[in-house]
């Protein structure tokens, strides 16, 4: 009986974090799409926090690149510069040289 309970606890311990990450990734995608719409409408003050939250939930390089572009458009050049540097570093590490080049 103890082994069964221990096995169930162990199984739940591996399943629950994966479920939480999937939910975070889905929420991040929704936020990213909304931010993209706002960015396209030049509503940078509304778009940038959504890009930031999307990146926090699912830290993908593309989300960080979008956030950097948003901060640049918003006039927050120091923030954008740091983010572009991070994008370039991460993109090169991921083998995405075209993205790294666009970030520089």
Name every feature range the model reports, one short phrase each:
Residues 1-4:
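Positively charged n-region of N-terminal signal peptides that target proteins for export
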Residues 6-15:
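Bacterial N-terminal signal peptides
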Residues 21-104:
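Alpha-helical, heptad-rich or low-complexity scaffold/stalk segments
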């Amino acid at each position: 009986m103890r082994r069964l309970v221990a096995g169930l606890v162990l199984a739940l311990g591996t399943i629950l974090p994966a479920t939480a990450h999937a939910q975070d990734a889905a929420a991040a995608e929704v936020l990213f799409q909304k931010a993209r719409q706002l960015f396209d409408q030049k509503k940078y003050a509304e778009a940038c926090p959504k890009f930031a939250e999307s990146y926090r939930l699912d830290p993908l390089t593309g989300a960080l690149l979008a956030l950097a572009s948003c901060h640049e458009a918003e006039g927050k050049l120091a923030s954008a510069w740091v983010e572009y540097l991070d994008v370039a570093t991460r993109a090169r590490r991921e083998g995405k040289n075209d993205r790294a080049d666009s970030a520089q």
